[in-house]
């Protein structure tokens, strides 16, 4: 199971991608050939030296130095270019030869011999409703209208209760004792009504 990617030469972009031409052996995009063609190279020092000397220094990349040992690196490369279309690793093989391509719900398929085709299933939905909020605001305004209006009047600032008297809930020596208790009762009713509405 291996994938062949040859980046030895970088010519112009192949026209077969745009003309939808089919190729039985390899498909090219940006000068990088990815295909099922088998390439056998003799893994000896002479062939390796000839191969490396035939390339310009700009074209030598990381794929040419997979190991510090030149012979091991060359052997790794020679084995990597042998591909099997039925193993599911060749990118230009058809989807029928890859049984694992139909597994799962989301599928991304690359077909380089007839252009690039990407299939993905994406679904999203956003729903925003403001109906309940409007009804709630109307309900709150109705409750506010039902609240009793509280009015308190005082003839003079001399009749303000002391803190000690107000904490005990009693009004001693106050001319407005009846008004005080009536006002306190109304405030208690309003507080209870507020608690019930909440």
UniProtKB/Swiss-Prot annotation:
Modified-residue entries (Phosphoserine), positions: 67, 154, 156, 164, 166
GO MF annotations, alphabetized: ATP hydrolysis activity; magnesium ion binding; nucleotide binding; RNA binding
Disulphide-bridged cysteine pairs: none
Record key words, sorted: Glycoprotein, Host cytoplasm, Magnesium, Metal-binding, Nucleotide-binding, Phosphoprotein, RNA-binding
Pfam families: Rota_NS26
Subcellular location, record wording: Host cytoplasm
Bias (Polar residues): 91-100
Principal localisation: host cell
Protein family: Belongs to the rotavirus NSP5 family.
Protein name: Non-structural protein 5
Keyword rRNA-binding annotated: no
């Amino acid at each position: 199971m291996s994938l062949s990617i040859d980046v030895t030469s970088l010519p112009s972009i192949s026209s077969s991608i745009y003309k939808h031409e089919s190729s039985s052996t390899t498909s090219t995009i940006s000068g990088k050939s990815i295909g099922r063609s088998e390439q056998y190279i003799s893994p000896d020092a002479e062939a390796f030296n000839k191969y490396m000397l035939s390339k310009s220094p700009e074209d030598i990349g990381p794929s040419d130095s997979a190991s510090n040992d030149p012979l091991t690196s060359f052997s790794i490369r020679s084995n990597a270019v042998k591909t099997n279309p039925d193993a599911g690793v060749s990118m230009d093989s058809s989807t029928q030869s890859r049984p694992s391509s139909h597994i799962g719900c989301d599928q991304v398929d690359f077909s380089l011999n007839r252009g690039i085709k990407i299939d993905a299933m994406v679904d999203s939905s956003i729903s925003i409703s403001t109906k309940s909020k409007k009804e709630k605001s109307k309900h709150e305004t109705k409750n506010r209208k039902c609240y009793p209006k509280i009015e308190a009047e005082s003839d003079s600032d001399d009749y303000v209760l002391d803190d000690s008297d107000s904490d005990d809930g009693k009004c001693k020596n106050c001319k407005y004792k009846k008004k005080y208790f009536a006002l306190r009762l109304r405030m208690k009713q309003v507080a209870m009504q507020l608690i019930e509405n909440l």
